[in-house]
């Protein structure tokens, strides 16, 4: 069973929502809202690749997906429904523009035009900054386009305002950005 254009995936840990946190051996529900995009599961396991796909992603790899992939919605009559990505038996279609990174069993790799930047702590200054240095970070996961421009993973970079789209990957806060959101190498 393969789709002509989409990956077929299952929710990582078989849960559509990532709204339970363990604290001191006790599970706490952090959100009961199905509309809360921050509580939706962002990780998927690849069940099948698209027909004639020849890229680096294989069955069993993990994908970092858009928050709408696994979400439930209410239809016009208030009935709970799965979103457009739902296929069947807890399987979902993920199109090429619905995932941002993949884990090949060794490391995370940015997909297509996406890159990931790790924010850095605020530098000492007479100007108050909230915890992170504004518009500055370390390129954590680059892409081929950035590499061709000479921007390498580990470079301290500056990025456009309002381009920060936060994800938590392996316990680390990262901003998902597009290649053209990177403004300079510092």
Where are these regions (language model features)?
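Acidic-enriched and Gly/Ser
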Residues: 1-186
């Amino acid at each position: 069973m393969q789709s002509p254009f989409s990956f077929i995936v299952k929710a990582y840990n078989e849960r559509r929502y990532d709204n339970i946190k363990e604290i001191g051996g006790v599970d706490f529900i952090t959100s009961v809202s199905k509309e809360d995009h921050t509580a939706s599961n962002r990780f998927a396991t690849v069940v099948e690749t698209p027909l004639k796909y020849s890229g680096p992603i294989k069955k069993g790899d993990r994908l970092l997906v858009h928050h709408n992939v696994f979400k439930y919605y209410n239809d016009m009559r208030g009935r709970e429904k799965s979103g457009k990505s739902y296929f069947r038996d807890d399987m979902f279609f993920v199109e090429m523009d619905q995932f941002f990174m993949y884990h090949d069993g060794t490391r995370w790799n940015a997909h297509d035009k996406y890159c990931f930047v790790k924010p850095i702590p605020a530098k000492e200054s007479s100007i108050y900054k909230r915890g992170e240095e504004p518009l500055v970070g370390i390129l954590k996961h680059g892409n081929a386009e950035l590499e061709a421009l000479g921007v390498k993973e580990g470079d301290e970079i500056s990025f456009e305002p309002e381009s920060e789209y936060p994800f938590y990957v392996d316990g680390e806060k990262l901003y998902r950005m597009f290649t053209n959101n990177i403004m300079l190498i510092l």
